[in-house]
From Swiss-Prot:
Chief localisation class: cytoplasm
Protein origin, superkingdom: Eukaryota
Subunit structure: Interacts with csul and tud.
Residue ranges of the TM segments: none
A Pfam family annotated for this UniProt entry: WD40
Organism, scientific name: Drosophila melanogaster (Fruit fly)
Protein purpose: Involved in specific localization of cytoplasmic proteins during the formation of pole plasm. Required for synthesis and/or stability of oskar protein (osk) and localization of tudor (tud) in both the nuage and posterior pole of the oocyte. Required for normal posterior localization of osk in later stages of oogenesis and for posterior localization of the vasa (vas) protein during the entire process of pole plasm assembly. May act by regulating the complex that contains the arginine N-methyltransferase csul.
Annotated WD repeat ranges: 101-139, 152-192, 198-238
Keyword annotations: Cytoplasm, Developmental protein, Differentiation, Oogenesis, Repeat, WD repeat
Tissue-by-tissue expression: In oocytes, localizes to pole plasm and nuage (at protein level). Expressed stronger in the germline than in somatic cells. In the germarium it sometimes concentrates in perinuclear aggregates that disappear by stage 2 of oogenesis. At later stages, it is uniformly distributed in the nurse cells and oocyte, as well as in young embryos, with no particular enrichment at the posterior or inside the pole cells (at protein level).
UniProt protein name: Protein valois
Length: 367
């Protein structure tokens, strides 16, 4: 019979006498055991800007929050940094106003207020951090303080948006179609509105209006867009559009303000075919307009800034900015921006910042 004790079965034979490591390079009689030494080394956990730049946010004081992640090997983890606008082109670990190392990836960062940052982690948690306080430290007011956290989503948060009309209210969504509306006005984060099955397909987009906290819009991969009413006692939504032909597959959403594009009754949806669709919430179940932005790649993100609509694509990564009021005339185009484009933000009326993998940050000047 075979020996019952694993220590006898798997122990190193007495006859195993390999030569020194330097002589093992061309030796075929003994296995190279250098991998054991490699696995025994401690991982380098020192703070650093990782290669994958995944999310960026900016507040009204032009202070940037940047999430970078290590996505190699078995252990994925990330770091969060804060920089002033004047530091944008020479970012480093030492020059950061604040930094935070996380055990998991930092997927999304969004400013709720100028000194209040929402952070979505890869382990499904949503955290709220205070980033600036002269009361806690008058000499170094930039310091992180955890205000609250919650694990209200069964899968990692993929969508996070703050209501401009009330920055202390935000909505989060995950790919499994779970939605949460958060009240940040108290001493902790409180979910005031929750839906566990907002869509029958994968949730891919979420957008909030500029002048209201009563509603928001979501879209999914199956070509469905829904308008949600937060005032209802139970989760309540209206179907804005449902693709009966099952041809459309939405990827992103943006909601214009009253002074932007065609007014605050219009919602813009990107799809996997590189097209941007316009929906009028006053005329549900009908697309008001469809424009092709990319002949290759899908629309990964839509950002509105005054009369301009910026569309970002992946596969390949590209950026296009159109003047919607001039018939969607393209006024700026940039090809092969990153190996993978992950996030973007407008810093002023004519400057768009994109981040991603490969080429980490690109500044787009719109003339």
């Amino acid at each position: 019979m075979f020996p019952q004790r694993s220590s006898e079965l798997y122990r190193t034979p007495v006859t195993h006498q390999p030569p020194p490591a330097l002589e093992l390079a061309g030796n075929l009689e003994y296995p190279n055991l250098n991998i054991a030494d490699l696995n025994a080394r401690l991982e380098n956990l020192s703070p650093r800007l990782h290669d994958c730049w995944d999310s960026i946010a900016i507040n009204d004081h032009n202070h940037l929050a940047l999430a970078t992640n290590r996505r190699e090997g078995r252990q994925w983890w990330g770091m969060l940094f804060g920089y002033g606008r004047d530091q944008m082109h020479h970012m480093s670990v030492d020059s950061a106003n604040f930094k935070l190392q996380a055990e998991h990836t930092v997927n999304i960062v969004r400013y709720a207020e100028d000194d209040f940052l929402l952070v979505a982690l890869g382990d499904t948690r949503l955290q709220a951090w205070s980033t600036y306080s002269k009361v806690r430290d008058s000499q170094s007011p930039y310091c992180l303080f955890l205000v609250g956290e919650s694990s209200a989503h069964p899968t990692p948060i993929s969508q996070l948006s703050v209501f401009k009309a009330d920055p202390r209210t935000a909505v989060s969504g995950s790919a499994d179609s779970t939605l949460n509306v958060w009240d940040l006005s108290g001493a902790d984060m409180v979910s005031t509105y929750r839906s566990r099955s907002s869509h029958t397909d994968k949730l891919t987009g979420l957008a909030t209006p500029a002048a209201s906290v009563d509603k928001f819009v979501t879209c999914d991969r199956g070509g469905c867009a829904r308008l949600w009413d937060v005032r209802a006692a139970a989760p309540s939504s209206t179907c804005l559009y449902a693709d009966a032909s099952h041809v459309l597959s939405f990827t992103s959403a943006a909601w214009a303000a009253a002074s932007e594009l065609q007014g605050d009754n219009h919602i813009y949806l990107g799809d996997y075919d590189g097209k941007v669709h316009t929906l009028d919430i006053r005329v549900p179940r009908k697309l008001a307009e469809t424009r092709e932005y990319f002949d290759k790649g899908h629309v990964a993100q839509l950002l509105i800034n005054g009369p301009h609509l910026a569309a970002m694509s992946n596969l390949p990564a590209s950026v296009k900015v159109a003047n919607v009021q001039a018939g969607h005339e393209f006024i700026y185009t940039h090809q092969d921006t990153h190996s993978r484009l992950t996030d973007a933000v407008w810093t002023d009326d004519s400057t768009l910042i994109t981040i991603g993998h490969g080429r980490k940050m690109v500044t787009h000047a719109i003339k």
